[in-house]
Amino acid sequence: MNLAAIAKNYSMHNGESGTIVPYVPPPYNFASAPTFSQRTSQMESVSLGILNQAMSSTTGASGALKDEKAAFGAMAEALRDPEPIRQIKKQVGIRTLKNLKMELATMRRKKSALKIMIFISGCVTLATSMVGGLSIVDDEILGDYKNNDWLMKTIHGLNLLCTTVLLAAGKISDKIQEEISRTKRDIAKRESYVSAASMSWNGDTEMSLQGIKYGES
């Protein structure tokens, strides 16, 4: 059998081997920019990480640590909000910060005035109490004290009045201090939100923090 017959016989038994198979190129993975859903998921991951950082820190017994926790929460909220809402809250927060700082300055002036009042009332109360104490120790002072009825009434009246003012001013000062702490915490939250809303975001976990600040005032 010659070569031509062998080739013909092979092609008859293996006819399918000569069919043309269309070429399908292998798939290629092209690099693409992060989609909106990916970006949102990454922002939520960063927000969750910030909240975990706030919860894993110290108990926040002092005012500074409480302000820090409030700042962490505000930053997490800023990263979790959509972009339009974030910009709206940023503009509103900038305007609100001015009013809050004015209120804080007013409350600090009131507290300073109350401190002066407490100091004066305390001095008068101490002086009148010392006069009453000396009248018990010294018989001569006690005699003059009893002979001058108007002096006794004046000293007792001043002592009672200044003691009442001292107690009332102390309670008012404590309430003002609570309002000051609450206002400072609100300022810290809004400053942190505005700072977080101004951060640059390039789609990865590296962010450029533009002067994150809280509780300055």
From Swiss-Prot:
The gene is Segment-10. May play a role in the release of virions from infected cells. It holds the Pfam family Orbi_NS3. Belongs to the orbivirus NS3 family. Coiled coil: none annotated. It comes from African horse sickness virus 5 (AHSV-5). InterPro entries: Orbi_NS3. This is Non-structural protein NS3.
